[in-house]
């Protein structure tokens, strides 16, 4: 028995499913999850001593690669000053200034501890500001595990085959209207059915929790226009895309202005952090200046702020996103060519530093139903073949992959060569 197998057996007796987040259990691909001992650069090293080229990147935060020296040093220095104070710090102010400088649509920002906290709080703020109850989200888009958002959700909810999680009261779910991603007609229909009741739309600008689905050109501007027409707020959930698709996020890449933005992952540099922010008028409705309540014991804690500040400082350098995009383009092109050589039907979507693989005969994958029509069984086989080759992809057909600045051209070529061998076995 390998060390991973032994640890998993122990973990299953102590932790539900043996993991602290469902997708890690390999439910979507079968088999025993890897237990990781350490990571460095573009590589993971499991407890059995095997190295893997990593395209999960802790589910997105590791844009600089693992164990980056600038982040490591920032954390060490912060730890030496104390772990948490429960009081304001200078680093919170510096971090807020940096975030609002980098994302021009955010006049103000509030730090929280996770992406779920960010989206949950932004929705509460939108409801409080507008005085309305209903929200619009999209099939296959995942915005964390708040009750009102686990309705036709993506990510682990898709992997587990539970679009509506047990434990979510019908009274909560009834205020969530679900539309089709990339389909403006479905959104207009929802607004026209409830013209005075919708507080906000919340949307992933690139849907990264049903793999990787970029928006059609008219989609995000169309959502902005519909929100303006019906008096709702537009919340762009950039927990995944923020600082990954572009320095100012997917909203800058696709030229759309939200009322509120949710952030996470990269802004913590590997530490647990979330944030939400936007127009000053809306943010001033938040306690203590306004009536909408939100709080957190560890929000803005000094360790996370130090790691996040170091990460954002590094990725603000000239040329970072050109390099990241070139690496992702190279991988996507190589995978397409390798699949074609082996007569494997494959669609590869990619934007900035994120990508998705779809085993499908379709020419494009643009919505939830397209994803549901893909060959999940073939992905499972491909995943395990790639794992044997030393390449670690997301262990679910419904999760995006992530490039880092630590990946080299040699890593990309190794990955493409491995994929070619795996395609030949499919």
UniProtKB/Swiss-Prot annotation:
One of the GO BP terms on file: protoporphyrinogen IX biosynthetic process
EC class (word): isomerase
UniProt entry tagged with the keyword Isomerase: yes
GO molecular function list: glutamate-1-semialdehyde 2,1-aminomutase activity; pyridoxal phosphate binding; transaminase activity
Cellular compartments annotated: Cytoplasm
Cofactors (names): pyridoxal 5'-phosphate
One Pfam short name: Aminotran_3
Superkingdom field: Bacteria
Major localization class: cytoplasm
EC number: 5.4.3.8
The keyword Cytoplasm appears for this protein: yes
PROSITE patterns assigned to the protein according to its UniProt record, in alphabetical order: AA_TRANSFER_CLASS_3
GO CC annotations, alphabetized: cytoplasm
Alphabetized UniProt keyword annotations: Cytoplasm, Isomerase, Porphyrin biosynthesis, Pyridoxal phosphate
N6-(pyridoxal phosphate)lysine carried by residues: 265
Subunit structure: Homodimer.
Family to which the UniProt record says this protein belongs: Belongs to the class-III pyridoxal-phosphate-dependent aminotransferase family. HemL subfamily.
Protein's name according to its UniProt entry: Glutamate-1-semialdehyde 2,1-aminomutase
Gene: hemL
């Amino acid at each position: 028995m390998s060390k991973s197998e032994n640890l998993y057996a122990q973990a299953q007796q102590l932790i539900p499913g043996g993991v602290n987040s469902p997708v890690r259990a390999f439910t979507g691909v079968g088999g025993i999850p890897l237990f990781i001992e350490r990571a460095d650069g573009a590589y993971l090293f499991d407890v059995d001593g095997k190295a893997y080229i990593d395209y999960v990147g802790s589910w997105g935060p590791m844009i600089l690669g693992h164990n980056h020296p600038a982040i490591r040093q920032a954390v060490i220095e912060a730890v030496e000053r104390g772990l948490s104070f429960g009081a304001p710090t200078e680093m919170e102010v510096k971090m807020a200034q940096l975030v609002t400088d980098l994302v021009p649509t955010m006049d103000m920002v509030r730090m929280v501890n996770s992406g779920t906290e960010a989206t949950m709080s932004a929705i509460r703020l939108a409801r409080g500001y507008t005085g309305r109850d209903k929200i619009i989200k999209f099939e296959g888009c995942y915005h964390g595990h708040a009750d009102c958002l686990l309705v036709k959700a993506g990510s682990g909810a898709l992997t587990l085959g539970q679009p509506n999680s047990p434990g979510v009261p019908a009274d909560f779910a009834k205020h969530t209207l679900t539309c089709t991603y990339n389909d403006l007609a479905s959104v207009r229909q929802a607004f026209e059915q409830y013209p005075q009741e919708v507080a906000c739309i919340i949307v992933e600008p690139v849907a990264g929790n049903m793999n990787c689905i970029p928006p059609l050109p008219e989609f995000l501007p169309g959502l902005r226009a519909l929100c303006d027409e019906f008096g709702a707020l537009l919340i762009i959930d950039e927990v995944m895309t923020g600082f990954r698709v572009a320095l100012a996020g997917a909203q800058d890449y696709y030229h759309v202005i939200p009322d509120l933005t949710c952030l996470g992952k990269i802004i913590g540099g590997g530490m647990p952090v979330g944030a939400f922010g936007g127009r000053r008028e809306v943010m001033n409705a938040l306690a203590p200046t306004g009536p909408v309540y939100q709080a957190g014991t560890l929000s803005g804690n000094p360790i996370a702020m130090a790691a996040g500040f170091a990460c954002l400082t590094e990725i603000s350098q000239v040329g970072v996103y050109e390099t990241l995009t070139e690496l992702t383009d190279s991988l996507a092109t190589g995978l397409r060519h390798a699949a074609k050589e082996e007569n494997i039907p494959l669609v590869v979507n990619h934007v900035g530093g994120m990508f998705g693989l779809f085993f499908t005969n379709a020419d494009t994958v643009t919505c939830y139903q397209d994803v549901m029509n893909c060959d999940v069984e073939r992905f499972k086989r491909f995943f395990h073949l790639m794992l044997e080759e030393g390449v670690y992809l997301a262990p679910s057909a419904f999760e995006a992959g992530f490039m880092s600045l630590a990946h080299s051209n040699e890593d990309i070529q190794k990955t493409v060569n491995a994929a070619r061998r795996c395609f030949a076995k499919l």
